[in-house]
């Protein structure tokens, strides 16, 4: 049986893109030094989570993978350290805008792109203003260390996401996430959120990160 060590990065994000990327790099290096082989960064870590307000100027934050500074930096870092890094970013593809993840293999190459399927829309998650529902479908990738599936944040509430990736042969499931509970409810939703993830892990007999 193969053993794979994974890490999940949690960090405070500011409005300074360069500062956020530098902080992410520092934490990836620390995780790699501790032996992690697959290192998950948070959802949309380049900026503060901007989806709580509708601002047309925020559309300018979207880029292609080739133009995205975080994707480029993490490609170089993955190749240097020999680690796999799923990188969340705001993607522009033609006239469409997506909440996406570039799965970067340990040689720095991009295995592929996943675009978030389930897009929330309420007072504090105005994501439908910013993102088109993804058109990639759920996917898995053979990386240097494991066959992995990647969803994004709100996808975690839906069991079919995890099940589809499990049936495609995923060995590990990753869900980069910006928010883990509802900020405006009187009752903390974090335990419900965590129980959903535990359910995905138990039902599909694999770790969920």
Give the predicted meaning of each segment:
Residues 63-84, 153-209:
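CN hydrolase (nitrilase-like) catalytic-core segments centered on the catalytic cysteine
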Residues 18-32, 72, 159-163, 167:
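Amphipathic, non-transmembrane alpha-helical secondary structure
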Residues 52-61, 122-123, 183:
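Short glycine/proline- and charge-enriched loop/turn segments
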Residues 6, 20, 28-57, 78, ...:
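Active-site beta-strand/loop signature of hydrolases that rely on acidic residues for catalysis
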Residues 10-15:
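Short polar catalytic/cofactor-binding loops
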Residues 60-150, 202-209:
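Catalytic-core segment of enzymes that process non-peptidic bonds
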Residues 1-6, 140-149, 172:
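Beta-strand-turn-beta hairpins that frame and shape the catalytic cleft
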